[in-house]
Every structure is written in structure tokens, then in C-alpha cells.
Amino acid sequence: MTSKSSPLIFERSREGRYAYSLPISDIKTNSVESLLDDKFIRKNKAEFPEVAELDLVRHYTELSNKNFGVDNGFYPLGSCTMKYNPKINEKVARIPGFSESHPLQDEDQVQGSLEIIYSLQEELKEITGMDEVTLQPAAGAHGEWTALMIFKAYHENNGEGHRDEVIVPDSAHGTNPASASFAGFKSVTVKSNERGEVDIDDLKRVVNENTAAIMLTNPNTLGIFEKNIMEIREIVHNAGGLLYYDGANLNAIMDKVRPGDMGFDAVHLNLHKTFTGPHGGGGPGSGPVGVVKELASYLPKPMVIKDGDTFKYDNDIKNSIGRVKPFYGNFGIYLRAYTYIRTMGATGLKEVSEVAVLNANYIKARLSEHFEIPYKQYCKHEFVLSGVRQKEFGVRTLDMAKRLLDFGVHPPTIYFPLNVEEGMMIEPTETESKETLDYFIDTLISIAEEAKNDPDKVLEAPHTTVIDRLDEATAARKPILKFENLKQEK
């Protein structure tokens, strides 16, 4: 591995340098020893970096120039909906009345903020076909877990606490079985059929008296719509189970069909994906959960409700599973999502889904002669191709993903879902132009040609990035996670 990376801020440090100085305080201060117990006081000086202001500014400016995001390049990361985040969202989120409010302020001082929360709940109820919505969960997996805890409380309250199995398709997001386990359930896998949809016969085999729920994404992770969803609903409901909708792929069906109309009992959404609250870099996210009326009394508290002309928190929720997030979730993301929904309107959201589906099918059609396409039918917002043809020349999907970096394109999701050999999952979203799509397609085709005629160029990629191919085995076995470890290595 060759590195052209910047030195760490600690490596720039020189003793005695500082970025700025403060005036000498004329306020009498107490010693640390007089304020804290001895066990809380450091025995050694903290090793903070010491740099001049100019060095500090240059360091972080240099790092920022090396970042890659939707604002500076195509980001077709399958199942992540890396769409453009409109800048009007940021303007609204920075309105002082919102950005400077505090979650512990009295209700009468934050009526505008509470109205935003209430109004967003109402919008999401309409979009999903659910009867009630909580905005508390902080991310998609958090929303999954919240919904499953609601299911668990519901079954226990109905004397069916023995229901401890959650059915998960073999193409599901990895968070689905993880959330099920975290909520105290066992995961049971249902197979996909030759069309990439849930195998109905296998579903009938795994459903039993212990079934608590099935977790589905529709369209699924292969980008295929589960056309038998009503039959799936009937099978699971007849067995006493509930249907959970993973909202990761809602971008494909807005104003076309609603999860509630498909028979789902609960749904989580990703405001940081579908509704343009920016994501990547660790957050913050937002994973609201909607439920049918039979489950409404189990939602986390408090809920924000409208009482006449005012808005307030409602803690009187009979069977509530309790709080799942301090205060009331990530409010800044609510502002961005609400702005997006109000800007687009129902017609705009419908067009979003139509163009997202069109873009995915356009790419799929143009690449079909150059790559193996395991599922031939029209896809929705994303699709999965396979690199098995290129594997014949010793080039794997990982190598092609690395080569894409040389062309200024973020690689798609690779080796997921697990039921496609050498899989590459591509989601272009609706915000990309035809010119961008064509550039990406032509680039992938050229890489496929390189795999056949000049495989070493692909195998040794990337060639133009700050860091060349990583030694992933050593990185996994001997991770250097802090500066102390780096000093030891050197």
C-alpha cells in the first residue's frame, strides 16, 4: 500500500505552538484539586496537538478537499439512496428559532418546533398509510428495533409471549436479523425463488405458531417488487404474525402504493435517505416508525399531539414501550425532511419514484450485454448485476469497484445481497442526469473490457487515489485505531 495521505494533526504538533491565546482572567478561580475528587484528576498531561492557527486551517482544509460526497461526484451506493440534498433544507434548518431552541424549553416557548414535529407525523402517515407515527428513533436499524419491541409488547399483552421467531428473507438487509436478535427474537430465513422474490412455498414451511413477524423490504434488496405481497400478508396474518416494512426502498414507490395498503402493520422510514436529510459520515439520521391503530398504544412516549390550537407532548400512552431516544429524536433532520416533502408535494414525490425507477432500468438495460444480470425482469429503483463473467479473467467485483475510483465515481454496494455471486448493487436515484448515468455506464463497460484485455490494470487499481489498495487483512487483524498505536508501530 502506498500512501499519499496527509499527516495526522498529532504529527503536525510541536510543543509550545498554539492557535490562539486568551486574555488573563481577573476572576478568582479554584484549583482543580479543590473541585474534583482525586480519582477524576489526570496524573499525566493530556497529549493534545499543539499547532499554529494557519497549520490547523490548512490541515482540515486539505482533509475536506479529499472527502467524497454527493455534492462532488456520482454515488450509486445500492440500498442507500444517495440522492442530492437540496440546500433549501439547510437554510430552513438554520433558522435561529429552530436551531437555537432547546428540547427542555417549556412547551409554550417551542410551539413552532412542536408544530413541525406534528405536521411531519401527519405527512408520513399519509405517505405510508399508517395510523400513527413516532419520530423518536434515530436511524433505520433503531426504527427496526423499535417496531419489533412494539410487536413483542403486543404479543405479550395478548397472551402470546411464546412468539419468538422473526422471518427474514435471504436477500434482507443485515440489520434485519441483527435487530430481531437485539429485540430478543430468533431469525428464521425464508428463501428467494428464481425471480428473486419470497418463495411462497418456503414461507408456508417456516411459518408456525411461534411466528411473531416477517420483515420485508418492498421492493426488496434486489430491486424487485414482491408481487405476491398480499398472499404473504394473508399467510403471516393467518398464523397470528405481524408484517414489518423496512422503509429502505420507499424511494421507489412514493405515491404509487403505500405499505399500509399492502397490509403491513408497522413501517420504519429513513428521513436521511428518502427525504434528503443528509447522511453518510455517521449521522445524524432519523428512522420514524408508523403503525396501524391496533399497535398505536404501544408507541414510544411522548407523542406530539394537537390540542385545539396548541401542540404538546402526550405521555399518557397506555401500553407504551417507553422512550427510545432522549428528548424527541434528531429535530434538525425533521426540518430538512419536512421542507423536502412540502417543497415536492404529492406530485413531486410521485415523480421522484418514477424517475428513480427509470434511471435504474436505463442503466440495467445498457449494462446487460456486458455483465451477468441474474434477474431479467424490470427492476424498481435499484438492481444487482454479477461480475461472474469478469471472474473468468481473474478479475473480481471488488477489483472493478476499486477501478471505478480512478474515474471519480463512488463504487456501488458490492457482495450484497449475499445470494448473488460477485454482486454489485446499483442505485442511481432520481437526481442524476442522463449525462452522469451515461458516464457511469461507459466507465463500467470500459472496465469490463480492461478485465478481459488488460486485467492487471484493474487488479492493481486504484491508481489515482490518495491511498492505493488497502491491505485489508492486516487492517482487520491489526487495526491502528488511535495515535498511541501508530507511535508504537513506528
Swiss-Prot record:
CDD domains: GDC-P. The keyword Oxidoreductase applies. It holds the Pfam family GcvP2_C. One of its GO terms (molecular function) is glycine binding. Its EC number is 1.4.4.2. GO terms for biological process: glycine decarboxylation via glycine cleavage system. GO terms for cellular component: cytosol; glycine cleavage complex. Coiled coil: none annotated. Keywords: Oxidoreductase, Pyridoxal phosphate. Signal peptide: none annotated. The glycine cleavage system is composed of four proteins: P, T, L and H. In this organism, the P 'protein' is a heterodimer of two subunits. HAMAP family: GcvPB. The glycine cleavage system catalyzes the degradation of glycine. The P protein binds the alpha-amino group of glycine through its pyridoxal phosphate cofactor; CO(2) is released and the remaining methylamine moiety is then transferred to the lipoamide cofactor of the H protein. This is Probable glycine dehydrogenase (decarboxylating) subunit 2. It comes from Staphylococcus aureus (strain bovine RF122 / ET3-1).
